[in-house]
Amino acid sequence: TEADLTLALSFPVLAGTGIVAALLYRNKVRITITDAVLTVWMLYYAGRVYAGGEYCCATVFLKTVSVYLLYVFLRVVFSHSCISAWWIKAGLVFFGCYEGLLGISQMINGTSRHHLYLLTGTFQNPGPYSACLMMAFVICAFTLSVCSGEGIRWRKPPFFPEVFSGIGKFVRLEYVLTVAMLPVVIVLPATWSRAAFVSIAVVMLLALRRNYWKYRYAVWTSVAVMSASLYFLKQGSADGRLMIWHASLASWWSEVWLGVGTGGFCNAVAEGMAVLHGDGMDLSGAGVTDYAYNILLKILVEQGLVGLGLALMAGGSALLVLRKSSTTLFYALLSLVVFSMFSYPFESLPYRIVAVMIVAWSEARMGIKVSETGRISAVAVLIVMALVSCQLSSVIRLRHEADKDYDMIRGLNDEAFVKDYYELLPLESDNAGFLFDFGKLLRSNARYNDSNAMLRRGALCSADPMFHVLMGNNYRDMGHCNLAEQSYEKAFAIMPNRLYPLYQLMLMYRDNGNVKKARIMAERVLALKPKIESPATKEMKGIAKEIMHDKRGSRKPLIE
């Protein structure tokens, strides 16, 4: 995206800032336990991508490298600066307050960025949007709980120190934080984000643990009531996520130590769904997913126990150090981590930047030293990283341009665009939407084998059963009915609450004159209750009724 490209272009500036700071100040850069574990984890991740190669994962890999480079640059910059935690906390509170005010405006004016949701802030979904409100609330609430009624203690900056000193005498911390909390408190419940509510509850229980024993019965009663309420609030969504987790673990079980491979989570879910369906599990509430809704589960499935162990060591070390550096930021980051156990905040660039910035600041301030490096070594590392970032930005720019070119030709089925799709393929090889559209284009021009080649690649980076349905259509048109039947059955096993795969299989049997199998399939179509009723499902059931009543479904179906 444009934001990823902007971040990559900022790396040389950060590297230059770090180099200047290292040359001007004689401070040595401490290498901490967290630094070491993160570096080992990054090396394992890169090695797993290089040696594995099960899935196309260039986009995910580039984003991960960007996060690691950002951490390295900020670690060096913060090591030579004396930035107070107040600046970070103030920035997060300001961000949350702004998003809260924007949410209020969207509720009043109906200007949400997504037509399905009442409010989304600057995000596309109220889920990630609620995370910034949650962090601002945690910072304000915890600071108010320990505030002693003193005025804000401004650090006198070099510009207008008298002005800032005067403000600190009259503006009280409680007033500022209370005003900042108002839009957050108003908007946060309107997001209906269960992940945010659970995260706030966990942080509150941890912060107030000293009073736990006295109020333990009330606490556990409240936890039980809250858990049941949040589950039944959106039971369908909760059941769907449980199915996603169960299916992904079913696939991971065959690759326990190293995982299925980077970028393979969605395919793991699809394959796991097929396995669970074969075992007779009810998957009527399942849906297509692009996210894991649990960051640790995604790491476990893609990187195995080795990757999860490194992630837990890095995260645990970072949180322990942060707790000593700033208790308020510790609770804020902890709330985001808990939030990521039920949602996907780290799929959004702002939260990756926030997490990296907090950890880099904390490690520079109070990280546990395992070694240290001098100015020359630090400058050398920064120069190497700057060169890597330049190459990274050029690759991201190429992929960003490819995304824009794809947007221009998306949905156009003229044969003249086949060449354009092939030119974009090396840069869009992990884009499921691109591969699906390319497969449709090739199919519309009767290039069935080429179409199936693209659809197979797309199925590796998506959990959508439509890839298998289109492959079945291609096999059917080529006369390979057995392969078509396998593709349709695989599509239904991945998502057994959809009529379309069974409907296509029923039509194939009817067109081939296999009346017996067509009626059997028509019975399955009529007996199945789809997850979402629509005019399309009614049309499919209408064709099935005609076949069942020996009318052979002679009229041409509206849905192909």
PLM segments and residue spans:
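Short coil turns that delineate tetratricopeptide repeat
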Residues: 429-430, 462-463, 496, 530
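Alpha-helical transmembrane segments of multi-pass inner-membrane proteins
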Residues: 10-21, 42-50, 59-76, 83-115, ...
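Flexible juxtamembrane loops connecting transmembrane helices in multi-pass membrane enzymes
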Residues: 118-119, 196, 200-204, 220-253, ...
